[in-house]
Regions:
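Generic cytosolic/nucleocytoplasmic N-terminal low-complexity/intrinsically disordered segments
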Residues: 1-2, 127
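Hydrophobic h-region of N-terminal signal peptides that target proteins for export
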Residues: 10-17
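Sequence context surrounding c-type heme c attachment/ligation sites in exported
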Residues: 20-144
Length: 144
């Protein structure tokens, strides 16, 4: 009973601390369509990264290259024009750098054929995702 009480108290304290945490990330104000596009791209990057990890587990470097290529600059160019003037330069640079990373992962998977090398590249690239998510939050502009 004492353990349960301690657990409940710790849970309440933890929740209280989290509720008071201030979100000091930069707010990016975009239209609902733009927000949907950005979030869709992020989900595509996440599912593509999972596909790369599955291929790496099988040591299928051809599949690694194919999945990485799909996340490269070709994917970025589809959205660049509609978002370029709306989003901060630093945000866009992080995104472009991540897409360039995937092109490099694809190239190296084809030429080097080393799953550990690819894992190191993927880990480094995911650091950009972390920086972005720690720095920005996306909000929809309110219609008048």
């Amino acid at each position: 009973m004492k353990k349960l009480l301690v657990f409940l108290i710790l849970g309440i304290v933890t929740i209280s601390c989290q509720a008071e945490e201030i979100d000091d990330r930069q707010v990016l104000q975009v239209t609902a369509v733009q927000r949907g596009h950005i979030l869709s791209e992020m989900r595509t990057l996440l599912s593509g990264t999972q596909a790369i990890l599955i291929a790496l587990a099988k040591e299928d470097m051809v599949a690694v290259s194919r999945h990485a290529k799909a996340l490269g600059m070709g994917m970025a160019r589809k959205a660049e024009n509609s978002l370029k003037g709306t989003l901060p330069k630093a945000f866009m640079q992080l995104g472009m750098a991540a897409h360039q990373d995937f092109d490099q992962i694809a190239t190296d998977a084809e030429s080097i054929h080393d799953p550990k090398h690819t894992l190191r590249q993927l880990s480094q690239s995911m650091g950009k995702c972390i920086v972005c998510h720690e720095s920005y939050q996306i909000s929809t502009l309110k219609s008048l």
